[in-house]
Design a protein with these regions (language model features):
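The catalytic-center signature of Zn2+-dependent metalloproteases
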Residues: 39-120, 125
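Active-site-proximal segment of zinc-dependent metalloprotease catalytic domains
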Residues: 1-67
Length: 126
């Protein structure tokens, strides 16, 4: 679902969010936030791709949302997110905006630890 406007600014947990997954089946994207960041972060398409893959990752239970990973990659400061800033499951794409000006679009693929976790979920290891 795409919602016009901004996330609830009174909730510090989501005030700067570009997308939010909820329940086990749904997520929303805030196109206005995508547009706000498009110039800095490689364009709206690149941001939207990264946000959709990130939120789908949450719907697939990444990172440690319904299991305990054998790989220590969850960011303790941002539960449910990877501490690998090259993974789409990193907690925020806008925190590296200045670097992104020179490096291109934000990550839109899962990191190796995320892929290993997905394999563990698929095979029933978790």
């Amino acid at each position: 679902v795409a919602l016009r406007g901004q996330p609830d600014q009174s909730d510090p947990g989501i005030a700067s969010s570009i997308g939010i997954a909820f329940g086990a089946t749904s997520f929303v994207v805030f196109p206005d936030r995508v547009d706000d960041l498009a110039l800095l972060l490689g364009g709206a398409d690149a941001i939207l791709r990264a946000v959709v893959v990130h939120e789908l990752g949450h719907l697939l239970c990444l990172v440690n949302l319904s299991y305990d990973s054998e790989i220590d990659h969850e960011d303790p400061e941002h539960p449910g997110h990877s501490r690998d800033d090259t993974s789409v499951m990193f907690h925020a794409i806008e925190t590296t905006a200045i670097g992104q000006l020179f490096q291109g679009a934000p990550p839109s693929t899962f990191g190796d630890a995320d892929l290993a976790d997905l394999e563990g979920l698929r095979t029933g290891r978790y």
